[in-house]
Amino acid sequence: MPAPTLFDYSDHSPYSNPGNHTGYFSELSTDPEELHRFACSVVVHYRAGGPDLTETQKVDPDRRWLTSILDAAEMRAPLDGPRTHAQQVAGCCRDHTLLALGVLRTHGVPARSRIGFATYFTPGWNADHVVGERWDGDRWVRFDPELDQQDFDFDVHDMPTGPGSPFVTAADAWLAIRAGTADPAAFGVSSELPDLHGKDFVRYYVLYEVAHRHRDELLLWDLWGPELGTSYVRAAAGGAVATWVAEAGLPGADMSDAEFDAVADELAYLLVAADAGDTEAADQLAELYREDVRLHPGERVLTLSPTGHAAITDLATR
């Protein structure tokens, strides 16, 4: 099975499709600074918003479809005008990036999201993060639509890549941890959240990176496959998750820890090789992702949201 092509990346996924807002998106600029301003006008980070979030905003982080984000934003204020904090949609880096992808793809620009860790928010900490990449005609240009250029000493619209770069892909992070050259305890959401940092956290982010590369831009709290068998997930929702997963027939929960490690190794090596231009590796990755039902999301996933919402989500019916 071939890897996604530039044509595929220039077309909308179900997640990035702006739906009835397509006409408005076709009028927006694809200039990187304009993308930043638009994304950060529509979406405020749910953690940065903190106690100031309204009751309506507190359910926003579970909006996985761009149409839902835009519908909510438009109900609160016109999309083409200024908006107050309370009129923004609460989301995260994934949503800022999805907005940018939506604009770029509407204009036929190949674009994709990348999952990994940012070194530029807290010294010594690799914060889980989502950024974008756009094709400029010759190469993939990495950018962070969440960042204001004046606050950073690197080009946020054409970010450095490779060893020592400010954004570490999940694949690179995993391979560094496996090689013993990176401290797994320094990767995740927060060092104060034991279930949301460390080796296992990076491991399932490799799975997210593969999914997003193949245009399945799910929420960072949508879980499937071997993620369903981890102790953190099994203990969620008062221990009810195992029953939910079994009743929903979701595959992969019985994958052993050792097998999950080996699968993550293979996926990470293929991701890194594909990034380096190895088309065979990219095709092999795509085939592995599509053919192994444990590695890609099916019609249903388990959602364990930071809002406290926990349920089996039917992606087919939205």
Per-segment meaning from a language model:
Residues P2-Q87, L99:
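Secondary-structure boundary elements
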Residues A258, A268-R318:
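Substrate/cofactor-recognition hotspot
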Residues S29, E33, D60-R63, R83, ...:
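Low-complexity, intrinsically disordered regions enriched in charged/polar residues
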Residues A86-I115, G132:
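Cysteine-centered nucleophilic/redox motifs
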Residues P2-S13, H36-T56, F117-V130, R134-E280:
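His-Asp-centered catalytic microenvironments across diverse enzyme cores
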Residues H21-Y24, P32, S113, V131-D136:
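Functionally constrained cores in energy, signaling, and assembly domains
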